[in-house]
């Protein structure tokens, strides 16, 4: 759970 998730990157800057 984190940047590894494409959906998470959608609204999270890594």
Curated annotation (Swiss-Prot):
Task: State the InterPro entries in the record.
Answer: Somatostatin/Cortistatin_C (IPR018142)
Q: Which GO terms describe its cellular component?
A: extracellular region
Write one Gene Ontology MF term.
hormone activity
Subcellular localization: Secreted
**Disulfide bond in keyword set:** yes
Alphabetical keyword list: Disulfide bond, Hormone, Secreted
Q: Is Disulfide bond given among the entry's keywords?
A: yes
Disulphide bonds annotated for this chain are 3-14
Signal peptide: which range, if any? none
Superkingdom classification of source:
Eukaryota
- Described purpose of this protein according to its UniProt entry: Somatostatin inhibits the release of somatotropin.
Recorded family membership: Belongs to the somatostatin family.
- This protein is called Somatostatin-1
- This chain's source organism reads Oncorhynchus kisutch (Coho salmon)
Provide the organism lineage as a comma list: Eukaryota, Metazoa, Chordata, Craniata, Vertebrata
């Amino acid at each position: 759970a984190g940047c590894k998730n494409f959906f998470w990157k959608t609204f999270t800057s890594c």
